Design a protein with these regions (language model features):
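Conserved alpha/beta-hydrolase
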Residues: 103-129
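Active-site glycine-rich loops that stabilize anionic/oxyanionic intermediates
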Residues: 87-92, 96-99
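Short beta-strand element of the alpha/beta-hydrolase
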Residues: 80-88
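The feature captures the conserved acid-bearing segment of alpha/beta-hydrolase catalytic domains
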Residues: 234-314, 319-321
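Conserved acidic catalytic loop of the alpha/beta-hydrolase fold
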Residues: 183-205
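N-terminal cap/lid segment of alpha/beta-hydrolase-fold proteins
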Residues: 25-78
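Catalytic active-site module of serine/aspartate enzymes centered on a nucleophile-bearing elbow/loop
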Residues: 330, 334-359
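Gly/Ala-rich beta-loop-alpha elbow adjacent to hydrolase catalytic centers
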Residues: 207-216
Length: 359
């Protein structure tokens, strides 16, 4: 005897199973659809012909790589525009999932709020590790560098009042979240793949973090399906019209001066057609300091403000929010997974509503 399970019943069963997890949603989420796919990428073909008797010879064989991987979930009755999430350097889609201390991340929080979510692993990272160019992964101890650079504190000490759990297991999970590039990072390759994702999602809001900020601008320039950009602590690759880039910003950071990238005026003007908001956390210096992590993010915040000013001077809509300036204290480089991430989610949801993006 065969049994048929309706799509709604299957979704309800999935919701129950999801909610049985130790780190479950605060309330059940009924999913209409869930799945994954690859987007973009290229195919390399070796010269010659494939020889069945010598299959390890690459002649005539193909290599599919440099694509993005996407995991998505769509709740029943979802808002019109989905949210597409792009991680930063040394990270993967895990950035947006369960937080290091086991709470709901933005994936779950915004599913609960009725948004379809699409989580990207960019080319040459995470589940999109297949590259069309060779690369080397060097196993170099660097956890404490990232702890410090991401402004949880000055390793091994946490900053006073920082929004990060002091549970040792949370720090263990935080470090294990780091993941390498399988080959050289290429902003154009990433932007092309993100644009291909947008072709599949159609109109959506793009949410980026750190290194993902720069490729996010390029994807928004390239693809009109990007209807808004929300960027958390973009760290580099701010774009300006050719001839209008600011001078490099000096810092005590080991990364060295921060330079701006340039695009054509026509390309830059595409960024003036969509709303953009940029968020930065706490423990960022106000003036030059030898405390390099705070100084590194000082110049990045400064460049973001120059970027916003350039957009707004052309009639655009770009806002930079330094969270301490609005009374939100203690955030690290990861506001969306910090202890107060629901407060950050409220800010983001409020902005989406203000811009009419949550219909």
């Amino acid at each position: 005897m065969q049994y048929k399970i309706s799509k709604t019943l299957a979704a309800a069963m999935l919701a129950v199973m999801v909610c049985g997890n130790a780190y479950a949603f605060e309330k059940p989420v009924l999913l209409e659809d869930q799945g994954s796919f690859f987007a973009g990428g290229t195919v390399v073909t070796a010269p010659g012909s494939f020889d069945y008797t010598n299959p390890l010879n690459p002649a005539g064989q193909t290599l599919h790589g440099d694509h993005a991987y996407v995991f998505y979930q769509k709740p029943v009755g979802a808002h019109k525009l989905p949210l597409v999430f792009l991680h930063g350097a040394g990270q993967s889609k895990k950035t947006w999932e369960t937080t290091p201390d086991g709470r709901d991340g933005f994936q779950n929080i915004f599913l609960e709020r009725g948004f379809a979510t699409y989580l990207i692993d960019q080319p040459r990272r995470g589940d999109a590790g297949q590259s069309t160019v060779s690369g080397t992964i060097n196993a170099v101890p660097s956890d404490q560098f990232w702890f410090t650079n991401f402004r949880a504190g000055n390793a091994p000490d946490f900053f006073d009042g920082v929004q990060f759990s002091r549970d040792p297991e949370a720090l263990n999970q935080y470090y294990r979240q780091l993941t390498p590039d399988t080959a050289k990072y290429d902003a154009k390759v990433v932007a092309d793949a993100v644009s291909a994702v947008m072709d599949k999602t159609s109109d959506a809001v793009l949410i980026t973090h750190s290194q993902g900020g720069g490729t996010g601008w390029l994807a928004a320039i390239k693809n009109p399906h990007v209807k808004a950009v929300i960027s958390f602590e973009p760290g580099s690759a701010f774009v300006f019209p050719k001839g209008e880039a600011p001078q490099p910003l000096k810092t005590s950071s080991p990364f060295g001066p921060l330079t701006a990238d340039t695009v054509t005026v026509a390309e830059f003007d595409r960024l003036t057609k969509i709303p953009i908001v940029i968020y930065y956390g706490d423990n960022i210096a106000e003036s030059y300091t030898d405390e390099w992590n705070k100084d590194s993010w000082r110049i990045r915040l400064d460049m973001a403000q120059k970027f916003a000013a350039a957009i707004n001077a052309r009639g655009g809509d770009c806002t930079v929010v330094h969270l301490p300036d609005i009374g939100v204290k203690g955030n690290t480089h990861f506001p969306f997974s910090d202890l107060n991430n629901k407060q950050i989610a409220d800010l983001m949801a409020g902005w989406l509503h203000e811009k009419g993006l949550d219909k």
